[in-house]
Amino acid sequence: LFSEHHLSHAASAFYPSPFQNAAILTLDGVGEWTTTSLAIAKGSDLKVVKEIHFPHSLGLLYSTFTYYTGFKVNSGEYKVMGLAPYGEPVYADIIREKLITVAEDGSFQLDMSYFDYATGLTMTNKKFDALFGGPPRTPETELTQREMDLAASVQKVIEDIILELVSVAKSGMN
């Protein structure tokens, strides 16, 4: 028996809950191919109604900034989250204007010309580096205000997008 990654997340959130109806939003790096999904649950019926597929991923966007700020992908994301309160979201507009496009329905696409994670050995490329003023921070070197501001910026952008997705999910329930 095999269950899709995002459907498993949705089921494990809904079925033990006290709710009879729910909108379930699942976001992560990537499941089999899905990175973001919206499921609607009514009674015992659970159906995924919307998906966004790899390489377009809020989780991988966050992991890209984890890499760029000098931390290890898939284990250092909490450090980026911890840095965010010490910075200002001065790069948020650049992220919104250059790296990600968000549609009215909450769906999004990354401009993959800035990223190498789908085809290369690193998360970013020279175009990404130029956008943020230089190469990634070397791991274990001193943190600067730039890393704190980058963390605050990606945190703000992703929080805003998630709020849009939640609004879409809520409207899908009505």
For every predicted segment, state its role:
Residues 1-174:
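Short acidic/glycine-rich loops and adjacent helix/strand connectors
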